[in-house]
């Protein structure tokens, strides 16, 4: 009885071993962004597996918020690869003959969104097998920059830093001195694997060229730093120069303002003078015409008077023209009425006329 039971169990083990199986073990694959990931899935068939061959790849996204999605399928001797939009056109079977036992795929141009668990399922009735692969996409360190944070002067404290523009954690750093003795200062040894080295009481011996290499599991990058520790600068001279420069700038600004204001005053004065000139006022007559009209009026008045009646008049200064003639419109001089004697009036043809007079009491005389 015991021998029969052992024979049955042995036959079951042999039959299980001969069924469909995937020979590639489960694993985790790490690749850099932009590279191609090879996901292996090799299988063997047993003589009992007589059904149609179906191969299916699925993805379980890393955020665990989405259900498993089919990314590529082989069924009925046809390939279907347009199930998952994020991987459309980037996932392919590596073998042209999947019946040979190779269901491996390539995922090209890897992105961070491709991180997740991929599952390979092979079916050939009555055999069924599956295997999982964990894919991790990392970003290579790139754009590393080395620089000094602080003043590179003797006796001062500053920091030298190494910073990559991008790169997946964890990151490792390594500092080296490339010039002179190529030996790092003793006080820096504890920080040679850090992104920042703190420099205390700097000396000229620290001057030189340094390199920083930053790396992770998928790549590395490097930057160089030229450190030049110099004596302290003359800050008093710099301050004095800054003050003098400021004063000169203020003086220049003041001069510009003064010139602008002066020009405005001149323009304003010219406008006022221009507005004071009236076009509707005729210009004053010349001195010659004024003097001639004055002399002519005197001659006409005096021509009808006898010499005896001219005693009360002073001789007019014809050579002097009043200054007021230049300031106002010339006017004919007003002369007192001439007194003519009765004999002269008779000779001139005058006719005597009797004019009644009125006495003080109102009677006419």
Swiss-Prot record:
Instruction: Tell me the segments the record calls region Disordered.
Output: 269-343
Q: Which GO terms describe its molecular function?
A: beta-catenin binding; cell adhesion molecule binding; cell adhesive protein binding involved in AV node cell-bundle of His cell communication; connexin binding; identical protein binding; integrin binding; PDZ domain binding; signaling receptor binding
Query: Which of the residues bear the PTM Phosphoserine?
Result: 297, 304, 306, 323, 332, 363
Q: Where is the lipid attached (S-palmitoyl cysteine)?
A: 259-260
Q: Does the keyword ATP-binding apply?
A: no
Pfam families associated with the record = Ig_3, V-set
As for PTM, the annotation reads: N-glycosylated. Palmitoylated on Cys-259 and/or Cys-260; required for proper localization to the plasma membrane.
Give the Cytoplasmic compartment stretches of this protein.
259-365
GO annotation terms (biological process): actin cytoskeleton organization; AV node cell to bundle of His cell communication; AV node cell-bundle of His cell adhesion involved in cell communication; cardiac muscle cell development; cell-cell junction organization; defense response to virus; epithelial structure maintenance; gamma-delta T cell activation
As given in the record, the signal peptide range reads: 1-19
Gene3D superfamilies, per the entry: Immunoglobulins
Q: Which residues cross the membrane?
A: 238-258
Short sequence motif PDZ-binding: positions: 360-365
Top-level taxon of origin: Eukaryota
Q: How does it assemble?
A: Monomer. May form homodimer. Interacts with LNX, MAGI1, DLG4, PRKCABP, TJP1 and CTNNB1. Interacts with MPDZ; recruits MPDZ to intercellular contact sites. Interacts with JAML (homodimeric form). Secreted isoform 3, isoform 4 and isoform 5 can interact with the extracellular domain of the receptor. (Microbial infection) Interacts with adenovirus subgroups A, C, D, E and F fiber proteins as well as coxsackievirus B1, B2, B3, B4, B5 and B6 capsid proteins.
As for what it does, the entry says: Component of the epithelial apical junction complex that may function as a homophilic cell adhesion molecule and is essential for tight junction integrity. Also involved in transepithelial migration of leukocytes through adhesive interactions with JAML a transmembrane protein of the plasma membrane of leukocytes. The interaction between both receptors also mediates the activation of gamma-delta T-cells, a subpopulation of T-cells residing in epithelia and involved in tissue homeostasis and repair.
Q: What is known of its domains?
A: The Ig-like C2-type 1 domain mediates homodimerization and interaction with JAML. The PDZ-binding motif mediates interaction with MPDZ and MAGI1.
Q: Please report the name of this protein according to its UniProt entry.
A: Coxsackievirus and adenovirus receptor
Name the species this protein comes from: Homo sapiens (Human)
Q: Which gene encodes it?
A: CXADR
């Amino acid at each position: 009885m015991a021998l029969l039971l052992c024979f049955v169990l042995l036959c079951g083990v042999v039959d299980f071993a001969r069924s469909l199986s995937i020979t590639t073990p489960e694993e985790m694959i790490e690749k850099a962004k932009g590279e191609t990931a090879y996901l292996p899935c090799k299988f063997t068939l047993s003589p009992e597996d007589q059904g149609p061959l179906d191969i299916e790849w699925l993805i379980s996204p890393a955020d665990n918020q989405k259900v498993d999605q089919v990314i590529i399928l082989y069924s009925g001797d046809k390939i279907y690869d347009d199930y998952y939009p994020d991987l459309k056109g980037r996932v392919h079977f590596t073998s042209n003959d999947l019946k040979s036992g190779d269901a491996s795929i390539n995922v090209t141009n890897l992105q961070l969104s491709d991180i997740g668990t991929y599952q390979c399922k092979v079916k050939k009735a009555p055999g069924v097998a599956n295997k999982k692969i964990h894919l991790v996409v990392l970003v290579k360190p790139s754009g590393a920059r080395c620089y000094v944070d602080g003043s590179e002067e003797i006796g001062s404290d500053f920091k030298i830093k190494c910073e990559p523009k991008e790169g997946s954690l964890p990151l490792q750093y390594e500092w080296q001195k490339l010039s002179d003795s190529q030996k790092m200062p003793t006080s820096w040894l504890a920080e040679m694997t850090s992104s920042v080295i703190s420099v205390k009481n700097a000396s000229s011996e620290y001057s030189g060229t340094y390199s920083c290499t930053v790396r992770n599991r998928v790549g590395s990058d490097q930057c160089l730093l030229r450190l030049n520790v110099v004596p302290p600068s003359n800050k008093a001279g710099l301050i004095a120069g800054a003050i003098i420069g400021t004063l000169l700038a203020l003086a220049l600004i003041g001069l510009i303002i003064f010139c602008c204001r002066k020009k405005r005053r001149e323009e304003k004065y010219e406008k006022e003078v221009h507005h004071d000139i009236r076009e509707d006022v005729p210009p004053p007559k010349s001195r010659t015409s004024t003097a001639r009209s004055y002399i002519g009026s005197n001659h006409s008045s005096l021509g009808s008077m006898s010499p005896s009646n001219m005693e009360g008049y002073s001789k007019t200064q014809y050579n002097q023209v009043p200054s007021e003639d230049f300031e106002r419109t010339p006017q004919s001089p007003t002369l007192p009425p001439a007194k003519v004697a009765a004999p002269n009036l008779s000779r001139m043809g005058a006719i005597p006329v009797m004019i009644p007079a009125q006495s003080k009491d109102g009677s006419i005389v």
